């Protein structure tokens, strides 16, 4: 069993970004700039934003955090997004999710200028990504691809099973791994909550790669996978004891894996690294550097 160490991979990617940024700024260009909008005081969101800001500094970026109370009206939030969209000194914009229930999340995503949508959630970017065109790719799914690429895990012609069909992970990673991207050309099966248990087991037991993102601790058990499987655990679940675990019964499943991501220390770090890659791409686009 080998660990797909997201921390090690992310540090390597961010260091490479920092080298590129140093070259750009030494030539007289301004520093790349990322803006994050945070609504309310959701503890996990606070933690994620803190990580993004810290990593942006390591990448050589400037970052701005715009905080708003949970009571902000949707119209006010959309107006602020429009303001950031029109700011030529901001390359990338993140609106930290989730949002309060009175704000329509899709309205907010759609309001972000596609050229600043470094989360890769805007329909224009998602559509281009689906068609295999250049676009900002959804960060968690992109981070998974970069992790597999970093460790030279074979993907082409492999059978990959994705458990979970969210717009953030399941759908985009299915598309990326099946498309002819820099990493891809896998045969992908997308499963979800309505997939019959027997069918799910039939698929996972034949899979070369299993990616799970369902938010259920220990969902993937040892009897569900074959020896030598590559297992990507996207889950982040806090138990009553306070321990953070993934969607995989790590202790019992790991011994069957050729590669597996730890939780924490796996996909989470890669999500942030992918955001940095997208921010650099937005910056390069602004200066016609790409």
UniProtKB/Swiss-Prot annotation:
GO terms for biological process: L-histidine biosynthetic process; methionine biosynthetic process; purine nucleotide biosynthetic process; tetrahydrofolate interconversion. Keywords: Amino-acid biosynthesis, Histidine biosynthesis, Hydrolase, Methionine biosynthesis, Multifunctional enzyme, NADP, One-carbon metabolism, Oxidoreductase, Purine biosynthesis. The keyword Membrane does not apply. Pathway: One-carbon metabolism; tetrahydrofolate interconversion. GO terms for cellular component: cytosol. It catalyses: (6R)-5,10-methylene-5,6,7,8-tetrahydrofolate + NADP(+) = (6R)-5,10-methenyltetrahydrofolate + NADPH; (6R)-5,10-methenyltetrahydrofolate + H2O = (6R)-10-formyltetrahydrofolate + H(+). Pfam families: THF_DHG_CYH (PF00763), THF_DHG_CYH_C (PF02882). NADP(+) binds at residues 164-166, 193, 236. GO terms for molecular function: methenyltetrahydrofolate cyclohydrolase activity; methylenetetrahydrofolate dehydrogenase (NADP+) activity. Its EC number is 1.5.1.5, 3.5.4.9. InterPro entries: Aminoacid_DH-like_N_sf (IPR046346), NAD(P)-bd_dom_sf (IPR036291), THF_DH/CycHdrlase (IPR000672), THF_DH/CycHdrlase_cat_dom (IPR020630), THF_DH/CycHdrlase_CS (IPR020867), THF_DH/CycHdrlase_NAD-bd_dom (IPR020631). PANTHER family: C-1-TETRAHYDROFOLATE SYNTHASE, CYTOPLASMIC, C-1-TETRAHYDROFOLATE SYNTHASE, CYTOPLASMIC-RELATED. Homodimer. Catalyzes the oxidation of 5,10-methylenetetrahydrofolate to 5,10-methenyltetrahydrofolate and then the hydrolysis of 5,10-methenyltetrahydrofolate to 10-formyltetrahydrofolate. Belongs to the tetrahydrofolate dehydrogenase/cyclohydrolase family. This is Bifunctional protein FolD 1. It comes from Geobacter sulfurreducens (strain ATCC 51573 / DSM 12127 / PCA). The gene is folD1.
């Amino acid at each position: 069993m080998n660990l797909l160490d997201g921390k090690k991979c992310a540090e390597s990617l961010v260091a490479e970004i920092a080298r590129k940024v140093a070259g750009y700024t030494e030539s007289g260009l301004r520093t790349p700039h990322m803006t994050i909008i945070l609504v309310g005081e959701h503890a996990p969101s606070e933690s994620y934003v803190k990580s993004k800001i810290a990593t942006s500094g390591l990448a050589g970026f400037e970052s701005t955090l715009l905080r708003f109370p949970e009571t902000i009206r949707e119209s006010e939030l959309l107006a602020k997004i429009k303001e950031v969209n029109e700011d030529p000194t901001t390359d990338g914009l993140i609106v930290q999710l989730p949002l309060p229930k009175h704000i329509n999340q899709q309205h907010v995503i759609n309001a972000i200028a596609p050229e600043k949508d470094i989360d890769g959630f805007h329909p224009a970017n998602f559509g281009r990504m689906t068609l295999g065109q250049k676009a900002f790719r959804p960060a968690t799914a992109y981070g998974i691809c970069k992790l597999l690429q970093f460790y030279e895990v074979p993907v082409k012609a492999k059978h990959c099973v994705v458990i979970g069909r969210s717009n953030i992970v399941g759908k985009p990673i299915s598309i990326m791994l099946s498309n002819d991207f820099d990493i891809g050309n896998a045969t992908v099966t997308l499963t979800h909550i309505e997939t019959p248990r027997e069918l799910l087991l039939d698929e996972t037991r034949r899979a070369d790669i299993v990616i799970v993102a369902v938010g259920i601790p220990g969902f993937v058990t040892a009897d569900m996978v074959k020896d030598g499987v590559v297992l990507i655990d996207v889950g982040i679940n806090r138990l009553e004891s306070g321990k953070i675990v993934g969607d995989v019964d790590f202790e019992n499943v790991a011994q069957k894996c050729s590669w597996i991501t730890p939780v924490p220390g796996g996909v989470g770090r890669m999500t942030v690294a992918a955001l940095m890659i997208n921010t650099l791409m937005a910056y390069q686009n602004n200066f016609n550097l790409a």
